A protein has these predicted regions:
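Polytopic alpha-helical membrane proteins, predominantly small-molecule transporters/carriers
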Residues: 4, 12-324
Length: 324
């Protein structure tokens, strides 16, 4: 679960055929993350160690983008500028280049905690509810920034997006409530899936909060705070549980590589394909592939209402990602 933008810029724009290939590769990378988690949870690996190794990859990538730019050396003076610019920035003016360094830290630290929790709940969700439902709920997290944007900035969705939101809420209810047995409707309630939905959504929202007020120049520093904090929290939890097994650590590295390339290929695909095409296909196809792989490779069997919830999720993600 890396953010959708690293600050990559392709040296040249690929053709539409190449962009479509990049989109396919992004989908495959995103799908493989959930499937690797299924393997790690089936073998009961230490999820904190897996998460630590993943965020080591992410932190290393962020550091590579910061190398030689001198942003870290400017953090000390940036604190005072950040406090001076804060009132004006929150009124809609945004931060300047120096103040954005402080904003990167202010938003990046709590965002790192959300990213850590999102990865933990994704792994728990895969173990408790299967890879199909867990993958669906992690993708549904996009609804959280949409809802908060309505409340905070009055960004009203289109009629089509409202339809997608309604379908998404329906899928959440179907997955968590057994409507066929009203007396025990809440017996199927899964707090882990809801926590997965919320933490992934808040992690995505942190990106929007940074981008709304901060400068793109400091985006790499923001990512370093996000991944660095997630790494520190997960490393602390890993060290508390005892010996770290090499197989668990290598599995985490195996997650980190597709996690990185999912974002990389997604950005490359956007150079020739429209956003309104890329994101619905990316989200919906990933869920379909995860569900198919869950059934074929791991013999997961969803109940009828859970299958319907996955179908509604796919439809909802297509609709909410459609742009004006």
């Amino acid at each position: 679960m890396l953010v959708k933008e690293y600050g990559f810029h392709a040296s040249r724009n690929p053709s539409k055929g190449a962009s479509l290939l990049y989109l396919i590769l992004a989908v495959l990378c995103s799908t493989s993350i959930a499937l690797i988690f299924k393997v790690s949870e089936t073998r009961r690996m230490n999820r904190y160690v897996v998460t630590t190794a993943n965020y080591m990859v992410a932190t290393a990538v962020s550091l590579s983008f910061l190398a030689g730019r001198g942003l870290l050396n400017r953090l000390g003076p940036a604190a005072g500028v950040f406090l001076e610019e804060l009132p004006r920035a929150l009124r809609g003016g945004g931060f300047g280049p120096q103040g954005s360094l402080g904003w990167a830290a202010a938003v990046g630290v709590p965002a790192g905690v959300m990213y850590f929790l999102g990865f933990i709940y994704l792994q728990k969700g895969v173990r408790e509810s299967g890879v199909s439902l867990a993958g669906s709920f992690s993708k549904l997290g996009v609804l959280v920034p949409m809802a908060l944007s309505i409340l905070l900035w009055h960004e009203v969705p289109t009629a089509v997006q409202w339809t997608g939101i309604a379908l998404a809420l329906g899928s959440i209810l179907l997955a968590n409530l057994d409507v066929s047995h009203p007396r025990r409707a809440f017996a199927a309630f899964s707090p882990v899936l809801l926590l997965l939905f919320l933490t992934v959504g808040l992690a995505e929202f942190s990106n929007k909060v940074y981008q709304r007020y901060g400068s793109m120049e400091a985006k790499s520093l923001f990512l370093l705070f996000v991944f660095g904090v997630a790494l520190l929290v997960s490393l602390f939890k890993s060290l508390r549980v005892g010996r770290i097994r090499a197989s668990h650590f290598l599995t985490g590295l195996a997650v980190g590589v597709p996690n990185y390339f999912a974002s990389h290929f997604l950005i490359l695909s956007l150079s020739q394909l429209r956003t309104a095409v890329v994101f619905p296909i990316y989200s919906a196809t990933t869920i379909v592939l995860i569900s198919l792989a869950g059934g074929l490779l791991f013999e997961e069997r969803l109940r009828p209402r859970e299958r319907l919830a996955v179908v509604l999720t796919v439809a909802a993600l297509v609709l909410v990602n459609l742009q004006r």
